[in-house]
Amino acid sequence: MLTPLQTYFPIAVALLVAVGLAAVMLALANVLGPRRPSEVKSTPFECGSLPVSPARERFSVKFYVVALLFIVFDIEAIFLYPWAVLLLPSDGYPGLGWAGYISMGIFVATLVAGLVYVWKKGVLDWAD
């Protein structure tokens, strides 16, 4: 019988092989790779055309707010999928029933209320 530590031995070996292989590849690329810096190589790449603005430029805070809202609603989708799968009974599983339905309704209502609040505050208004 294997001890709990022995059951994780193959995972540890796979992890060590992956880290070792990555380290060897990085070391070989660093040792064998050519070093010929030039002005063209140091310019930022902009879809094959010449850059029209500096690479280090401040972004508007609105981009970050939209990114945070995307993450919130993406996490909502992550929670909705397993809920939808487990809501109805199937294959001997009793299902979530009304308690699961009501709890997800409260969750979605909270997120919709947050979206309405954000909308009313004008966070999603890009006119200004």
UniProtKB/Swiss-Prot annotation:
<dbReference type="InterPro" id="IPR023043">
    <property type="entry name" value="NAD(P)H_OxRDtase_bac/plastid"/>
</dbReference>
<comment type="similarity">
    <text>Belongs to the complex I subunit 3 family.</text>
</comment>
<dbReference type="InterPro" id="IPR038430">
    <property type="entry name" value="NDAH_ubi_oxred_su3_sf"/>
</dbReference>
<comment type="subunit">
    <text>NDH-1 is composed of 14 different subunits. Subunits NuoA, H, J, K, L, M, N constitute the membrane sector of the complex.</text>
</comment>
<keyword id="KW-0874">Quinone</keyword>
<feature type="transmembrane region" description="Helical">
    <location>
        <begin position="9"/>
        <end position="29"/>
    </location>
</feature>
<dbReference type="GO" id="GO:0008137">
    <property type="term" value="F:NADH dehydrogenase (ubiquinone) activity"/>
</dbReference>
<keyword id="KW-0472">Membrane</keyword>
<protein>
    <recommendedName>
        <fullName>NADH-quinone oxidoreductase subunit A</fullName>
        <ecNumber>7.1.1.-</ecNumber>
    </recommendedName>
</protein>
<comment type="function">
    <text>NDH-1 shuttles electrons from NADH, via FMN and iron-sulfur (Fe-S) centers, to quinones in the respiratory chain. The immediate electron acceptor for the enzyme in this species is believed to be ubiquinone. Couples the redox reaction to proton translocation (for every two electrons transferred, four hydrogen ions are translocated across the cytoplasmic membrane), and thus conserves the redox energy in a proton gradient.</text>
</comment>
<dbReference type="GO" id="GO:0050136">
    <property type="term" value="F:NADH:ubiquinone reductase (non-electrogenic) activity"/>
</dbReference>
<dbReference type="GO" id="GO:0048038">
    <property type="term" value="F:quinone binding"/>
</dbReference>
<dbReference type="Pfam" id="PF00507">
    <property type="entry name" value="Oxidored_q4"/>
</dbReference>
<keyword id="KW-0997">Cell inner membrane</keyword>
<feature type="transmembrane region" description="Helical">
    <location>
        <begin position="96"/>
        <end position="116"/>
    </location>
</feature>
<keyword id="KW-0520">NAD</keyword>
<keyword id="KW-0830">Ubiquinone</keyword>
<keyword id="KW-1003">Cell membrane</keyword>
<keyword id="KW-0813">Transport</keyword>
<feature type="transmembrane region" description="Helical">
    <location>
        <begin position="68"/>
        <end position="88"/>
    </location>
</feature>
<keyword id="KW-1278">Translocase</keyword>
<dbReference type="InterPro" id="IPR000440">
    <property type="entry name" value="NADH_UbQ/plastoQ_OxRdtase_su3"/>
</dbReference>
<keyword id="KW-1133">Transmembrane helix</keyword>
<dbReference type="GO" id="GO:0005886">
    <property type="term" value="C:plasma membrane"/>
</dbReference>
<keyword id="KW-0812">Transmembrane</keyword>
<dbReference type="GO" id="GO:0030964">
    <property type="term" value="C:NADH dehydrogenase complex"/>
</dbReference>
